[in-house]
Amino acid sequence: MTDINRMKNKIKAWLWLGFALVWLAIFSGLFAISMGWIGYLPPIEQLQNPIDKYASQLIAADGEIIGSFAHSGTNRVFVEYKDISPNLIKALVATEDIRFESHSGIDFRGLARAVVKTGILQQKSGGGGSTITQQLAKMLYSPPSSNFFTRMMKKPVEWVIAAKLERYYTKEEIISMYLNQFDFLYNAVGIKSAAYTYFGKTPDALSVEEAAVLVGMCKNPSVYNPVLRRNSPLPLERRNTVFQQMVKAGYLTEAEADSLSRLPITTSFHKMDHKQGTAPYFREHLRKIMMADKPERGDYASWQYDR
């Protein structure tokens, strides 16, 4: 064996050793996080029963919803998986997490691709590597941060939370939770509010092109917003990218995607707030009653309550 071959073998051995040490450090860190030794990990009870803030709905005697009241400017209304259009589910999985059905919260293949393409090759189209479950974990338990180092430190915690969520929930429940949590702007938090706000529809009635618009917004609800950016080509380009992802996943043919890509984005915008809907004066009166402090006897004369 020549000196050159010996040197090559040594380099290979050191590279494999370094590779093994990196993975050992990653798995050791994940184990430490899962045991609660590093970082904050929500208790099991909170993972099994996430705290959700939904709008309070005002329902008439015949069961008709005549309005809603939302806290902090949101208008989230829960919708079950069975009431979500298959077009929306297919578009979401194809675009955000193509291996959603096969992974357990962390897509190591997608993560490796993102590291190589984005981190090493500096390609903008490398993808983020985050699964739908990881994104849900971030929405539920990881407040947004503008600090890059802080975001990177939170990633391993999000991985562990995602793996635990996969243990406690079915894939259908995770899809439903994700779509119920996402903020589509204009007080449209959750897919039910978003479907009505942007298209005047219920989630189960969304067409392929409408579903693609909403899924496209999941990357950035401001940049790819068809109302906020109505004069920008970005929402249309993003929608068409979703079509191409659906082709790769086998949900659309090239001909179908090409035909859909020629369509303009047509919205039916309805910004939702508590003033819209049936009987606004009655609902406002009811809201004031519900928000009022509990009466105290000391605030009234005896003749006012002793009857």
Regions found by a protein language model. Name each.
Residues 50, 80-132, 189-194, 199:
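Flexible, acidic/glycine-enriched loop-and-adjacent beta/alpha segments
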Residues 37-87:
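Terminal hydrophobic membrane-targeting helix
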Residues 124-307:
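Non-catalytic, structured segments within soluble enzyme domains
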Residues 50, 71-72, 104-109, 152-155, ...:
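Short, glycine-/polar-rich solvent-exposed loops and beta-turns at beta-strand/coil boundaries
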